[in-house]
Amino acid sequence: MGANETKNTTILAMDVVKAIHAKLPDTHLVMHGSSSVPQDLQDIINEFGGEMPQTYGVPVEEIETGIKNGVRKVNIDTDNRMAITGAIRKVLTEKRAEFDPRAYLKPALEAMEEVCVDRFQRFNCAGQAPKIKAIPLSDMAARYASGSLDPTVH
């Protein structure tokens, strides 16, 4: 979805997600367009010269429900872009003579990091990276060729 595509809170068909997960429990689902479009980030953008119309995304609670039911990849790019944009607008408004990108990119990255840390914690993926083992491309190709990665329908 993007930041300008819905005019009210998006409620997902979690019954469908749950049904898919029940039939294909080993299949990892992806939530495209799952940014929450936080109101506080919209407010920062608009307070510092933006003209972002009132819009809504997917409530984080809905995403959390999806994760409990087989969703393994969630796209939150819009939230990150909003955090970056708001931080840059704030610096450039408050320090109008500023021209050094380091002065506005550092707070922009910090704002994005804040969004990411929040989502990593809420989505229960914080601290999980050490559990991921790198798999060589040749091994993955062999898995695909053997059919061992084909979905199992229950």
PLM features per residue range, with description:
Residues 1-16, 47-52, 90-109:
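Glycine-rich tight-turn/loop motif centered on a GG-T
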Residues 9-31, 35, 39-47:
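Alpha-helix-loop-beta-strand connector modules within alpha/beta enzyme cores
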Residues 13-19, 42-56, 89, 131-137:
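Short, electropositive alpha-helical surface patch
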Residues 58-154:
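C-terminal alpha-helical cap/extension of soluble enzyme domains
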